[in-house]
Design a protein with these regions (language model features):
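Membrane-embedded segments
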Residues: 1-3
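Short basic (Lys/Arg) and small-residue
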Residues: 5, 9-188
Length: 188
């Protein structure tokens, strides 16, 4: 509240600066990509609660999270990538050279998306397996990427897969279920 969100070394009408920002009491999906993952995780966690007991909704939500995570992976041909990078770099150089944003913390993103579901669904073999498959898909799609964000996605997915596996192993009672989740985890 007490920190400025914009500075200008030119005489600019303050209304122009104020109009460039949206300030509100509620987060929005457009302004905060993590917010969408938090909402999806809350839907899944609520579906896993004893009062609702709807594992199908949790599984569908995990599938939605997977598809959204994969939007960060957009394979293009080298020519397309080079052309789009030079076009966008040139465009950004002139239009947005004074804007800076904090980098997206991939570990926080994965934590928002998976941790509560892994915790609340640890005792359900179907949910535990779906989480493992989701994270395996993400790792497979990002594993050959050369960018730091792709490496961060693989690292975060590996970390969450291990945590989810360990939670499930502690929560599951039936020996065959424990063996199933172990096989799926080790297949990663």
């Amino acid at each position: 509240p007490e920190r400025a969100i914009a500075y200008s070394n030119k005489k600019v009408v303050s209304d122009e600066i104020v109009d460039a920002f949206t300030i509100g009491e509620a987060r929005s999906f457009e302004a905060d990509p993590r917010f969408g993952f938090i909402v999806l995780a809350e839907i899944a966690s609520r579906a896993l609660s004893p009062s609702v007991n709807d594992h199908g909704t949790a599984i569908n939500t995990i599938s939605s999270i997977t598809r959204l995570m994969l939007l960060w992976h957009n394979p293009k041909s080298e020519t397309e990538t080079e052309n789009s990078q030079s076009d966008s770099a040139q465009h950004e150089e002139f239009k947005y050279d004074r804007i800076s944003l904090p980098a997206l913390n991939v570990n926080d993103l994965f934590d928002d998306a998976y941790t509560s579901i892994a915790r609340d669904g640890a005792a359900n073999i179907e949910v535990a397996i779906r989480i493992q498959k989701s994270l395996k898909t993400i790792k497979a799609c990002f594993k050959d990427g050369g960018t730091s964000i792709e490496r961060d996605f693989v690292e975060a997915a590996s970390k969450l897969a291990k945590q989810s596996y360990e939670r499930a192993k502690l929560a599951l009672d039936y020996e065959d279920d424990i063996k199933r989740i172990e096989r799926v985890y080790n297949d990663n």
